[in-house]
Amino acid sequence: METVKIGDVDLCYEVFGEKNTQSIVLISGLGSQMIRWDIHFCNLLVEKGFKVICFDNRDSGSTVFNTKKEIPSDKGIEEVFAALSKEGIPYSLMDMANDVIGLLNHLKIEKAHIAGRSMGGIIAQLLGSYYPERVLSLTIIMSTSLNPALPKPDPEIMAMMTQPAADPSVDREGYFRAKIHFAEKISGSGYVFDLNQETTLLEEELTRSRTKNGIIRQLLAMGSFQYTPDMLKKITAPALIIHGTDDLIFHADCGKDIADSVSGSELMIMEGMGHSIPRELNDFISDKIYDLVK
């Protein structure tokens, strides 16, 4: 893994399949680190001829958003959220999209295929709309346009997402218990929840994390996003939309909304898939991406 300075961000990234000529950027979701893109999935894309670029979004994992305004560690998410909102939004989703462009510029990549999951799918939409000359194709997984008319997230899940997390340095067991419970809750009914995989990822995320509660600034970026249907209508790149029937964060109608708004896009509704990508779908999704671009 390497780090590059892009504006006020020290961005951590990793490239797989350096010698391949077709580049694909994988964009993670809210509070999610690049290691959530399963290494087997990355290797499958490499085998299909892709140079795979993974990175941590600002305020996630080993990527640091350099700011003098620290996030208080002794207050709940809602309290901090309210305080930061009054001071102004630290950055926008468009700033996060510009981080991707900065990374492509650093790597001297003129055009790339883009795949984003959850919030990363919104960033992918922004790239497809505002940087069409840089985007060869879009794969948008379990995401949303943030159209206010769409169904809201499950209330129980929203409560779990916004309640303060236990400090793992003080209550490691409580931290893991809550995180695992949440991950299992959103995983969907069609696939067996892999407890060992989730535990391993959580342990690695703790080791890699550089910013405590950085997710709050990402939430502010999402909360300040102004939906406009014109953004999706401007997308001209080939687009694949993948969404699960069991998604409790972004209802399946969110995926349908994107597909209805992006001309010529393909929609795949996956039975039993929740708001995560089970390993059982790695082959299928990598095949669909290859079919999209070949």
Report residues per predicted region.
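Conserved acidic catalytic loop of the alpha/beta-hydrolase fold
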Residues: 82, 90, 94-112
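Short beta-strand/loop motif that positions the catalytic acidic residue
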Residues: 235, 241-243
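Catalytic active-site module of serine/aspartate enzymes centered on a nucleophile-bearing elbow/loop
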Residues: 265-294
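Conserved alpha/beta-hydrolase "acid-adjacent" motif
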Residues: 248-254
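Flexible "cap/lid" loop of the alpha/beta hydrolase fold
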Residues: 138-169
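Conserved hydrolase catalytic core segment
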Residues: 110-150
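Conserved HGGG/HGGXW glycine-rich cap/lid loop of the alpha/beta-hydrolase fold
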Residues: 9-83
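Conserved alpha/beta-hydrolase catalytic His-Asp/Glu region
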Residues: 173-216
